[in-house]
């Protein structure tokens, strides 16, 4: 066996204190001389900026996008997932959203069962100014279909835990129904095309 590995770490603390704020994602490089991060101030995804990773001034924060109305797949809530991927067309960002799903009446209660359905989507942001949305497709790229995505600790969930690009292939590691880990893959060019034109 080899020697143990020690990971260096820096704890940067919360971006916002005292409110429902999660789904933090740090961009892989500085933009305009600042560190950039997504965070979710319910119900919208916000962009925050920092010069030192420790202070995130409120005046450098802005909402980028939020839930869509009507019958969209992300009509209730949205959040960011995985480090944005830099492409020639902009920042390719995976996101999640959910909406309420009403299922048929149960035999025990006679009333409908209301659950959430979490899906994965993609959004393209401007490369130099990620506060600008270049395109946001109307449909998700991935949704629960397998039994282990539909039934588990939290049913009807696919939730991206990390995205890796190897060559021209994108590997999306995701949680299924909050109890298993799955892997979905696609070609980077296909995902970029869908983000641009979908």
Each model region followed by its residue ranges:
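Electrostatic interaction modules used in gene-expression and signaling proteins
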Residues: 163-165
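Beta-rich carbohydrate-recognition and catalytic domains
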Residues: 1-76, 85-153, 167-170, 174-198
């Amino acid at each position: 066996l080899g020697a143990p590995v020690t990971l260096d770490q820096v704890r940067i603390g919360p971006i916002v204190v005292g409110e429902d704020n999660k789904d933090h994602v740090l961009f892989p490089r500085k933009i305009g001389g600042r560190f950039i991060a997504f965070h979710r101030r319910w119900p919208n995804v916000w962009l925050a900026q920092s010069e030192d990773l420790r202070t995130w001034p409120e005046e450098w924060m802005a909402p980028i996008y939020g839930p869509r109305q009507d019958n969209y797949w992300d009509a209730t809530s949205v959040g960011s997932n995985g480090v944005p991927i830099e492409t020639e067309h902009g920042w390719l960002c995976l996101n999640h959203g959910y909406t309420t799903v009403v299922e048929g009446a149960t035999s025990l209660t006679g009333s409908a069962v209301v659950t959430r359905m979490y899906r994965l989507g993609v959004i393209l942001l401007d490369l130099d100014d990620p506060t600008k949305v270049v395109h946001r497709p109307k449909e998700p790229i991935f949704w629960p279909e397998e039994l282990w995505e539909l039934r588990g600790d939290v049913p009807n969930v696919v939730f991206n835990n990390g995205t890796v690009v190897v060559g021209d292939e994108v590997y999306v590691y995701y949680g299924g129904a909050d109890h298993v880990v799955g892997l979905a893959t696609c070609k980077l060019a296909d995902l970029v095309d869908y983000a641009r034109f979908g």
